């Protein structure tokens, strides 16, 4: 049965009321019948409008809809109810449909003329009144049904999304339909916003995969009740066991006023370091949603406080149960993958890949069973991983010579015991005035040695540098010339010079960087990238960009001014810093890097020359800021360009196997080493490039006495984890901030690596 585009009433639907009006002549009954007829007419008009709206929606929308039969049956049911009511009112009636029109006729057998009696009149009047009330009541009921959503539209799919590669994130569920999202871009934007509220992501969502890694290219491919994986910055699909058992799909909502406990839990399991945004360590991080008070669970409070007091970033060595010699793997544990004992077992399962499946039992090297979270962060750093198989306590805990050699090789760079330094004290590299872009790093050769010759008169050198730029005061942009006064040159590089300037109104000093475009032909994209990146950055430990003016010959950048100069000069003056001073600087540097990396930006040229410091009256460093973003870029895939400064370059850059954000952590580890002893961990005779690169690739270095004899094990452990040759187990920037030495909690300790 089909309802067509319009509904036309060709005859009075309630003709019985008209017939009774002529037969009885009762005014009361006539009025009631007229009201009922009017209500019925209004009802039919609304049904007609509803049907027209339905057809328009079907014409303009080519989407999957609810069953037409079920949708069309609703108006038919309404008409049937109306017919029944009319029939009960008149005793007989019909409502017919033909060619999209409704026709109705009814007749009433009334008393012959002149035989009307008071009794019959009362009966007819009461019947008519009751029928009228029934029609009015039915009309009101049907109006409610009409106002409800009966227009067939596509039902929104409830779809769960996971973060790519994150096996601990419980996922987030949203309704998806073509009405809600007109394009993939709008869905990407919404997913980016929602994921940022629950978990740290490296950038915007750019790709969606199904659970087997197939790329989704259209909204129609998303199926109701299914789960999908969101990928940021076009990263490849990571096949892991996603947390599909965290909560039933039907129970998850996105209502802002009813966030589920799993969402709060997801954020609590990934606490941002209190140092990440420059907040002092003394200020305890406040859990999202009010912490324990928000979820009302003292158990959660105790569990997370235990994690915060026990868990600190560290690398553990895992021996996979199997045929000897057994496979040995390293794993980085931190607050993001180790919020609980079960999470650690899951992380171990992913890397050891037992034939029997999930890791069920873990033992220390001495055969002691690991039963709680704190056992992974004690003095032991080597563990045996077992599934459901039986443990042979006699043979399994004995290491073969090949296994022992492999573990000793891993521990070699984790030794805290100093070795005597042979020969003279190594020297700091000569201060570099330039960062070497791709293709120029290895061609540097011995230019740094020659640069150590005494310069000419400083004033003459500055005048020559200023003249070499071809910039006259009159040529400066009006926005700079009218608002600032020029002062001395405070720095120079390969493509630019930096002058100190002052605001004419406030007297506040700033730095003016003048980039000569003629000196960087073919490298203009580095200038554009520097400006583009700096415009995005707002952090207390990153130099701020105040103004940029682009002209045909030069690019002008007005930057924040830091009075203490760069860290290289500070190291030259004091040779080495105390642990407390070094802690302040690595906190600030780690905070800046963590901020950059959270935005998917890698600096690629972190070195003392690009770190500016503020000093107090006693010459102590009170603040450090990261500067010079000439090589910075956004990471959307592995990078291969060989660039940076030789002393601070990471091994994966030299090996040209692809690198990412963690090259900045390596450079920061080199700097921390230098701060404490006055020379870098990797040196070569006469600063020769190839031997230096070979030493970096080997990853072997020492903490030689007497230069390290008074330096504690905590900072050595941090350096060892920052200078891991394998990027997968190297600390992240947040791990630097979470390390017990950085936080000043050295009583926690991290085990003895001297054995």
Swiss-Prot record:
Q: Name one GO molecular function term.
A: protein serine kinase activity
The Doublecortin domain sits at 157-243, 314-397
InterPro entries tied to this protein: Doublecortin_dom, Doublecortin_dom_sf, Kinase-like_dom_sf, Prot_kinase_dom, Ser/Thr_kinase_AS
Keywords from the named record: ATP-binding, Kinase, Nucleotide-binding, Phosphoprotein, Repeat, Serine/threonine-protein kinase, Transferase
Top-level class of the enzyme under EC nomenclature? transferase
**Alphabetized SMART domains for the sequence:** DCX, S_TKc
Report biased composition (Basic and acidic residues) as residue ranges: 53-66, 74-84
What processes in GO biological process is this protein linked to?
A: intracellular signal transduction
Write out the ranges of the annotated region (Disordered).
Answer: 18-128
Annotated membrane-spanning segments are none
Q: In the Enzyme Commission scheme, what number(s) does this protein have?
A: 2.7.11.1
Query: Which positions bind ATP?
Result: 490-498, 513
Alphabetized Gene3D superfamilies for the sequence: Doublecortin domain (3.10.20.230), Transferase(Phosphotransferase) domain 1 (1.10.510.10)
- List all Low complexity biased stretches: 18-52, 100-128
The catalytic activity, as recorded, is: L-seryl-[protein] + ATP = O-phospho-L-seryl-[protein] + ADP + H(+); L-threonyl-[protein] + ATP = O-phospho-L-threonyl-[protein] + ADP + H(+)
Q: Where is the Protein kinase domain positioned along the sequence?
A: 484-742
Q: Which domain of life is it from?
A: Eukaryota
- PROSITE patterns under this entry? DC, PROTEIN_KINASE_DOM, PROTEIN_KINASE_ST
Any keyword tRNA processing? Answer: no
The active site of this protein is located at 605
- Which spans does this entry mark as compositional bias, Polar residues? 87-99
- Which family is this protein grouped under? Belongs to the protein kinase superfamily. CAMK Ser/Thr protein kinase family. CaMK subfamily.
Protein name (database record): Serine/threonine-protein kinase GL21140
């Amino acid at each position: 049965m089909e309802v067509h585009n319009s509904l036309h009433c060709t005859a009075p639907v309630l003709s019985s009321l008209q017939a009774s009006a002529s037969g009885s002549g009762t005014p009361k009954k006539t009025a009631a019948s007229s009201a009922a007829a009017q209500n019925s007419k209004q009802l039919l008009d609304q049904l007609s409008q509803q049907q027209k709206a339905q057809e328009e929606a079907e014409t303009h929308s080519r989407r999957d809809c609810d069953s037409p039969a079920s949708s069309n049956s609703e108006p038919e049911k309404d008409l049937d109810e109306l017919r029944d009511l009319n029939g009960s009112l008149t005793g007989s009636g019909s409502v017919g449909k033909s060619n999209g029109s409704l026709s109705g006729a009814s007749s009433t057998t009334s008393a012959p003329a002149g035989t009307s009696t008071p009794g019959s009149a009362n009966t007819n009047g009461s019947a008519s009144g009751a029928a009228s009330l029934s029609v009015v009541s039915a009309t009101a009921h049907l109006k409610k049904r009409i106002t409800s959503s009966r227009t067939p539209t596509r039902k929104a799919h409830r779809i769960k999304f996971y973060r790519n590669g994150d096996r601990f994130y419980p996922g987030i569920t949203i309704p998806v339909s073509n009405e809600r999202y007109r394009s993939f871009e709008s869905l990407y934007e919404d997913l980016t916003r929602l994921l940022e509220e629950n978990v740290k992501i490296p950038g915007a969502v750019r790709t969606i995969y199904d659970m087997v890694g197939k790329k989704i290219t259209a909204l129609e491919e998303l199926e109701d009740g299914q789960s999908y994986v969101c990928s940021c910055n076009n990263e490849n699909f990571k096949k892991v066991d996603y947390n599909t058992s965290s909560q039933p799909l039907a129970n998850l909502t996105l209502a802002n006023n009813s966030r589920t406990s799993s969402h709060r839990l997801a954020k609590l399991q990934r606490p941002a370091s209190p140092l990440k945004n420059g907040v002092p360590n003394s200020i305890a991080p406040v859990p999202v949603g009010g912490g324990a008070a928000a979820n009302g669970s003292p158990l959660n409070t105790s569990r997370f406080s235990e994690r915060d007091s026990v868990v600190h970033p560290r690398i553990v060595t895992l021996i996979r149960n199997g045929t000897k010699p057994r496979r040995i793997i390293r794993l980085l544990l931190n607050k993001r993958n180790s919020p609980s004992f079960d999470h650690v077992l899951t992380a171990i399962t992913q890397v050891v890949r037992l034939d029997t499946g999930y890791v069920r039992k873990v033992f220390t090297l001495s055969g002691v069973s690991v039963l709680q979270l704190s056992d992974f962060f004690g003095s032991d750093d080597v563990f045996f991983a077992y599934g459901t198989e039986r443990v042979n306590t006699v043979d399994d805990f004995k290491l073969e010579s090949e296994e022992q050699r492999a573990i000793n090789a891993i521990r070699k760079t984790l030794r805290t015991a100093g070795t005597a330094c042979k020969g003279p004290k190594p020297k700091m590299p000569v201060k570099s005035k330039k960062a070497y872009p791709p293709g120029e790093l290895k061609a540097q050769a011995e230019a740094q040695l020659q640069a150590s010759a005494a310069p000419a008169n400083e004033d003459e050198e500055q005048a020559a540098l200023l003249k070499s730029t071809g910039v006259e005061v009159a040529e400066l942009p009006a926005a700079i010339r009218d608002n600032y006064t020029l002062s001395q040159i405070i720095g120079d590089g390969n493509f630019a010079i930096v002058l100190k300037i002052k605001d004419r109104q406030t007297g506040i000093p700033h730095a003016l960087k003048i980039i000569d475009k003629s000196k960087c032909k073919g490298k203009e994209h580095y200038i554009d990238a520097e400006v583009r990146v700096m415009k995005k950055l707002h952090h207390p430990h990153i130099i701020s960009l105040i103004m940029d003016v682009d002209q045909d010959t030069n690019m002008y950048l007005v930057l924040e001014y830091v009075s203490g100069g760069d860290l290289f000069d500070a190291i030259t003056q004091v040779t080495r810093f105390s642990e407390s001073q070094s802690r302040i600087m690595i906190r600030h540097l780690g905070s800046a890097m963590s901020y950059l990396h959270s935005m998917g930006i890698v600096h690629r040229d972190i070195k003392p020359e690009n770190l500016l410091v503020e000093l107090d009256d006693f010459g102590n460093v009170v603040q450090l800021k990261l500067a010079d973003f000439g090589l910075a870029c956004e990471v959307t895939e592995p990078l291969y360009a060989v660039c940076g400064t030789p002393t601070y370059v990471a091994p994966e850059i030299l090996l040209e196997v692809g690198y990412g954000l963690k090259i900045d952590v390596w450079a920061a580890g080199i700097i921390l080493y230098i701060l404490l002893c006055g020379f870098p961990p990797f040196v070569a005779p006469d600063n020769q490039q190839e031997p230096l690169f070979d030493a970096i690739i080997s990853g072997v270095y020492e903490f030689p006495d007497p230069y390290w004899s008074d330096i504690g094990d905590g900072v050595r452990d941090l350096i060892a984890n920052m200078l891991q040759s394998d990027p997968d187990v190297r600390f992240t920037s947040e791990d630097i901030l979470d390390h017990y030495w950085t936080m000043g909690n050295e009583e926690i300790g991290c085990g003895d690596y001297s054995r």
